Design a protein with these regions (language model features):
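C-terminal domain-boundary segment and adjacent tail
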Residues: 50-139
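Active-site-adjacent pocket scaffolds in enzyme catalytic domains
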Residues: 1-72
Length: 139
């Protein structure tokens, strides 16, 4: 599935193509997992990746700054196995360039988000999906 042209923010999807936005529809709102530009050692160029708090410290920083300049809502994803060292099994590497497999990375990345928000004069608020929906449908 090609999501490259999909909005990187909550949107009302078109009936003919759910990946593109149509006029505001109070009946349906899509909350995509947000992507930011990232680059790690094995990447030739920057790539859009889902915002994952289990990434190594610093991987998200530049992309998040760009994202927060244009967006108010961030939807991230983290899988439980990505923060447990025992799940990293690669005989060729001592560490993974992208995923940390450490719980501390979640804290580090959240702290980076808080620092960035303060620098950009943004408020941080953790919301339930129902709160986000009411915010977007009552604009």
């Amino acid at each position: 599935i090609d999501w490259l042209n999909t909005p990187n923010k909550p949107y009302s999807p078109s009936i003919s193509d759910y990946r593109i936005e149509k006029e505001r529809n109070r009946n349906f709102l899509e909350f995509p997992l947000n992507t930011v530009k990232t680059k790690v050692s094995y990447d030739k160029d920057y790539l859009p990746r889902y915002v994952n708090l289990a990434f190594n410290k610093g991987v998200l920083r530049e992309g998040l700054e760009e994202f927060f300049r244009e967006n108010d809502t961030l939807v991230s994803i983290t899988h439980p196995f990505e923060v447990v060292k025992d799940f990293f099994v690669d005989s060729n590497q001592k560490s993974h360039p992208l995923l940390s497999f450490k719980r501390q990375s979640v804290i580090d990345n959240l702290e980076d988000i808080l620092i960035l928000a303060r620098r950009l004069n943004r408020e941080i608020e953790f919301l339930k999906v129902s709160d986000i929906i009411s915010t977007y449908t009552n604009e």
